[in-house]
Amino acid sequence: MRITVMTAGEQIITLDVDSQETVENVKALLEVESNVPIQQQQLLYNGNEMGNSDKLSALGVKDDDLLMMMVSNASSGSATSAAGNDLGMNPDGSALNPAAFQQHIRGDSNLMGQLFQNDPELAQVISGSDLNKLQDVLRARHRQRSVLQRQKEEELALLYADPFDVEAQRKIEAAIRQKGIDENWEAALEHNPEGFARVIMLYVDMEVNGVPLKAFVDSGAQSTIISKSCAERCGLLRLMDQRYKGIAHGVGQTEILGRIHVAPIKIGNNFYPCSFVVLDSPNMEFLFGLDMLRKHQCTIDLKENVMTVGGGEVSVPFLQEKDIPSRFLDEERVPNDASSSGATVPSGFTEKKNNTVANPTSQQPKRQNTSEGPEFEAKIAKLVELGFSRDSVIQALKLFEGNEEQAAGFLFGG
């Protein structure tokens, strides 16, 4: 018959055994599968401990039944084996040789990095010089682990007391699922530890209208963005065209105040023309988006950690973490509310122009002028010659305020 054994560590083991098999022989099989010595195994069936000499059939174990294996503490054996090892631990969780333990952990930069991320208090103590405090923290961590382990064992024991209970089955399923998540996390720590590190975004040094700035390079943003305060500091706010108001969509959304059609930017030693979408975003100064990356043939070279411009005529390095203002790094650490902050907008940013004018009464005469006069009629005639009806041509020209090229593109696009 087939039985399933679940360990206290939530490992699932399936065994094919005879119904007349003794519990001791089952434990021998489990020792091979789990590496837990027979002496430390404690098998439970329906919440009751199984004796080594008992047979499975005598205990009522049937095909597809579930057993639970607990592991008893072998503190004396652990203490003996740890005595010859300076890096060993005492039964209370403290280090046998705290100085050697501290030195060993300090020498592993990857482990220290994980500690600073997962247990900053312990990492700070290891970095310090107070060995007594280190021992106290290690004992506290050991007590916490012991309490959690005991709670888990008690909960599992209650679950397996009635394994056919629906709620118990649901909790067992959740425990198995969590075990898979934990194993995936442990595998990532071993094989992909950089996945837990904070990624430093791409910044380069630029000058906008003669003002030095740290530009955030984001190929996921449709347009190049400048904040209202930054545009004012660069002397460009007076050039903002408010007819280009709209909504910026990304992770969240924010209002587009207008557009600055062209201004000089300096990358390396060269000057380039650049247009900007202006946002009222205090958390983001200047974002170099996909429109200008394409226009100036920029290449993001992550192997060399540089951005090349103009097909390679200029190459500027991406800034190291120490060169990036701390306020930008803080924004990366703490996610902002998408509805109130432009910091969540840039990556994946697209702009949606708002054709609704703020003051219809004052703007209406301008719209009427676009549909009057010989110039407008000449545009209609050109587009009608392309095969479009006069009514659709007039509607398209009015939609784009007399812009013949945009109207033609709209008509051809259906």
UniProtKB/Swiss-Prot annotation:
Residues 374-414 form the UBA domain. Residues 213-292 form the Peptidase A2 domain. Its EC number is 3.4.23.-. The keyword Hydrolase applies. InterPro entries: DDI1_N (IPR033882), Peptidase_A2_cat (IPR001995), Peptidase_aspartic_DDI1-type (IPR019103), Peptidase_aspartic_dom_sf (IPR021109), UBA (IPR015940), UBA-like_sf (IPR009060), Ubiquitin-like_dom (IPR000626), Ubiquitin-like_domsf (IPR029071). Residues 332-374 are annotated as: Disordered. It is an enzyme of class 3 (hydrolase). SUPFAM superfamilies: Acid proteases (SSF50630), UBA-like (SSF46934), Ubiquitin-like (SSF54236). Residues 1-76 form the Ubiquitin-like domain. It is found in: Cytoplasm, Cytosol. One of its GO terms (cellular component) is cytosol. Residues 355-372 have a biased composition (Polar residues). One of its GO terms (biological process) is proteolysis. Keywords: Aspartyl protease, Cytoplasm, Hydrolase, Protease, Ubl conjugation pathway. One of its GO terms (molecular function) is aspartic-type endopeptidase activity. The active site is at residue 218. Belongs to the DDI1 family. Homodimer. Receptor of ubiquitinated protein targeted to ubiquitin/proteasome-mediated proteolysis (UPP). Relatively weak affinity for both 'Lys-48'- and 'Lys-63'-linked ubiquitin chains with a slight preference for 'Lys-48-'linked chains of three or more ubiquitin units. This is Protein DNA-DAMAGE INDUCIBLE 1. The gene is DDI1.
